[in-house]
Amino acid sequence: YPLLERIIRQTPERFTLLEAESTAYIHTTIYQLPEIPSDADIICYGVWTDPFAAAGHRVFMMDRRNPAHLDFAIEHADAETLRQYVSTHIPLMDTGLHLFTEEAHKAMAHCSIDTLKQRFKVAVVPLTKATYYSFATTEEMVRSTMNLQNIVQDQRLILQSNLPKHPSLFTQNAIIDRPLTAENGNIWIENAHIARNWSLSHDNVITGVPENDWDITLKAGQCISVLPVGAERYAVCLYDFATPYTATDLPAYHLCPDATQLGKVLKALIAGCPTEAQTIEGCKLEVNTERLTEQRLKF
């Protein structure tokens, strides 16, 4: 984590805690970081962005007449709301990188927000020439990975000219018995077997599917997650590509006694038919990591 290391090296000693978001990557080409205000107790690093990219995240709204001044912040902002402030404010997306002095950190556990505002000064520091890549949702994972693949735009740095952009098709540790075509987009296949009778659309993420000979047709936006449970059972989940699930709001998994029943349950879920399979909340699922590792080695 070069950026985190740079922040630690260049941060004044009065700051004792660095908080970092685990579902994001910040790419920057600047080695020397911006100076930190000498009177600040809490530092929030941000990146300049456009309303579309900032949608769904915490956004600092900076006064357009004085971009160094934080006017207010919006939690989980939507693009339309941000566009309403275009003439008066510049959106600065919160990177999730925050610095705290020891006193401010200790006070957070005992004080209200109003008390913190009165006792401590918060400064928002923009990271110049930086880009924020979020991996918090399925859609963001695919989009950020594609953008990182195409990060080099300067043709002088590309050995072969006129190369097409990297497509949004990602396969890792997978066996695919049928080719992906130009009609497929936003496809992510990991630790899975796609048999010859499978048919994919776009906005499909498929993970953990064991070796099979099923006849599966996925509609646009349908995603599959399969996990091994116990000695022989599998848990399968059908979820939506565009839905931003949280750790406490995961879709339910359906328990199957073996791989044969797994295929039948999966077909029923895709067709929208009821199943007799027992369901369990995703956050309560106990995965057999040994079987998961064995399956990965097969692929």
Q: Which positions does each model-derived feature cover?
A:
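A generic "binding-loop/recognition-motif" signal
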Residues: 21-22, 138
